[in-house]
């Protein structure tokens, strides 16, 4: 383990303070990650995706693929974006979330997130470069890394950094990269993210089960019921009188 990289670069005091974060804080961070994934899947255009990730200005890609929690060696990349058209490019994205609305660079948590996030991105890129099937005669794919700090509630970008990678190309084909990422991403998580969520408009209206309209009777006022009761008594006295034309 390189003592100058990742959490190893923190002092003993800062490292102990970072590891002492309450479980509720860590759980909130995990939930924010899942919301980031769902948000990315809901975006329909590259402009929307680039805005959410605060990517630098560049070409407008017309087709791209998303992969989540991809196991790359001993690291897990939060998200890998593979842009396909007009030319292939790979973005490795690491999310770090905060409860505050500012990414205070002096806080122990921010320093730890920055150090660990940068190490994660570099390790993921190195693993991809050595593990993807090489293609002879191919110029390879350009690879970039993005460390994105988000607010846990609003998912607003607080800060974004683009760590420098040792090599900026992956010596492989687009097909080879997509196949590997499909196998290495968390399939159960992806299935859960892809599952359609019921909406208020999608619910079927409740069907009221009750008597048919022909079976409904109107409420009769008390005075009218009294009058009808008297009429019924008179009819009882007339039992035995057969009306002409009546059939049994």
From Swiss-Prot:
InterPro entries in alphabetical order: Herpes_UL24
GO cellular component: host cell Golgi apparatus; host cell nucleolus; virion component
Induction description: Expressed late in the infection cycle.
Presence of keyword Membrane: no
Subcellular location: Virion; Host cytoplasm; Host nucleus, Host nucleolus; Host Golgi apparatus
Keywords from the UniProt entry: Host cytoplasm, Host Golgi apparatus, Host nucleus, Late protein, Virion
Region of interest (Disordered), residue spans: 194-248
Feature: compositional bias, Low complexity: 218-227
Keyword S-adenosyl-L-methionine attached: no
Primary location group: virion
Family according to the record: Belongs to the herpesviridae UL24 family.
Function: May participate in nuclear egress of viral particles. Plays a role in the dispersal of several host nucleolar proteins including NCL/nucleolin and NPM1. Since deletion of host NCL/nucleolin negatively impact on nuclear egress, UL24 supposedly acts on this process through its effect on host nucleoli.
Protein name, UniProt field: Protein UL24 homolog
């Amino acid at each position: 383990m390189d003592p100058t990289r990742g959490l190893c670069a923190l002092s003993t005091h800062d490292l102990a303070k970072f590891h002492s974060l309450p479980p509720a804080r860590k759980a909130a961070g995990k939930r924010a990650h899942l919301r980031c994934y769902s948000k990315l899947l809901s975006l329909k255009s590259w402009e929307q995706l680039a805005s959410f990730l605060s990517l630098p200005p560049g070409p407008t890609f017309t087709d791209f693929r998303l992969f989540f929690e991809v196991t790359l060696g001993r690291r897990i990349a939060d998200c890998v974006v593979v842009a396909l058209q007009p030319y292939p490019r790979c973005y490795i994205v690491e999310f770090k979330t905060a409860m505050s609305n500012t990414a205070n660079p002096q806080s122990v948590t921010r320093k730890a997130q920055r150090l660990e996030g940068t190490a994660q991105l570099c390790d993921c890129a190195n693993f991809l470069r050595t593990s993807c099937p090489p293609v002879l005669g191919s110029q390879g794919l350009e690879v970039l890394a993005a460390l994105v700090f988000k607010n846990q509630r609003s998912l607003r970008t607080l800060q974004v950094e683009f760590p420098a990678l040792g090599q900026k190309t992956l010596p492989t084909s687009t097909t080879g990269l997509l196949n590997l990422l499909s196998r290495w991403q968390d399939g159960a998580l992806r299935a859960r993210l892809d599952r359609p969520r019921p909406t208020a408009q999608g619910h079927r209206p409740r069907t009221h089960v009750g008597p048919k309209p022909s079976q409904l009777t109107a409420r009769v006022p008390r005075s009218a019921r009294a009058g009808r009761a008297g009429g019924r008594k008179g009819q009882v006295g007339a039992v035995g009188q057969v009306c002409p034309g009546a059939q049994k």
